Amino acid sequence: WDIHNEGTQPSVRSVTNRLDAERVAVREALGYGAPHFPLADHYATDGDEWMYGRKGHEQLVDSGDWREHIVLTEHRYMREDTQQGLAFLVSVADWAGVAAPTATGLLAIGSAICDDDFRSSGRTLERLGLAGLDRAGMTKLLAEGL
């Protein structure tokens, strides 16, 4: 499996573009403005260059350096990216009242694959003790930290 090859096919990209749009919507709901560093910029062939440059993606695919055997139920794509990152995104979207159907659906699929309810076991506002914050409290936390 190579995340930069098989993981970036057009059909997969359409899903990640929707997921990224939900991430940007959550950022905006929290009061963050641009730049949002959309993932699509990494694959763009025109416009402003992003942090990897125009040939970055092509060079990653051609290198073969990212090819790896994965045990999906144990891999970081599930246990870090989904259980921790996506669970957090979904919980913040819920808190902020932002629709995140792609993130929510992927979280449910990841939970089923791993036979683990990532909404319960993942990193969420609830598990961090932050779900009870009101808008002013969240704004203060984001500006000042704990």
What residue spans do the PLM features occupy?
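Substrate/ligand-engaging "lid" and interaction regions
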Residues: 1-19, 139-145
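Short, flexible active-site loops
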Residues: 1-10, 37-42, 67-74
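A broad "ordered helical/assembly scaffold" signature
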Residues: 5, 9-11, 22, 26, ...
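Small-residue-rich helix-loop
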Residues: 12, 16-65
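C-terminal helical cap and adjacent loop that interface with cofactors, partners, or active-site loops
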Residues: 47-146
